[in-house]
Amino acid sequence: MRIIVDADACPGRNLIEKAAIENSVEVIMYCDINHELKSDYSEVRVVDSGFQSVDMKIINEAKENDIIVTQDYGVAAMVLGRKAFAISPKGYIYDDDNIDRLLFERHLSAKARRGGKKTFNPKKRTDEDNLRLYNNILKLINKAKEKSN
């Protein structure tokens, strides 16, 4: 089990690392060459800046029981197919029960934008988001440990 983070624009990295340190879990953070990222705990892997290069690297790297932190529903869907866990930086857990709906809603929003309609921007990050991320990362770590035994 590892925690793999799409770290290009991921708030809450410190909370992810805190949970990982407390549970002795390896963390790998991926970013492209346009982002500078440093960590005393996590392994930082830098990839080319090509279209979806970080996403593709994460999808290919994901293994069963890994925990993937991503905002991208497409990445979440792909890693769920590899029997990994997926969670957003706001702490929402993606699973087989909600990923199809999320992908469909993303499709509808993109279609509306192409048609000239305005869609809503994401809300600002809150302390509740931080707490949800930390608690749900711990929850997924425990689930992954149970599945490994």
Swiss-Prot record:
Entry superkingdom: Bacteria
InterPro entries recorded: UPF0178
Transmembrane regions: none
Signal sequence extent: none
Family according to the record: Belongs to the UPF0178 family.
PANTHER family membership: UPF0178 PROTEIN YAII
Full protein name: UPF0178 protein NT01CX_0440
Source species: Clostridium novyi (strain NT)
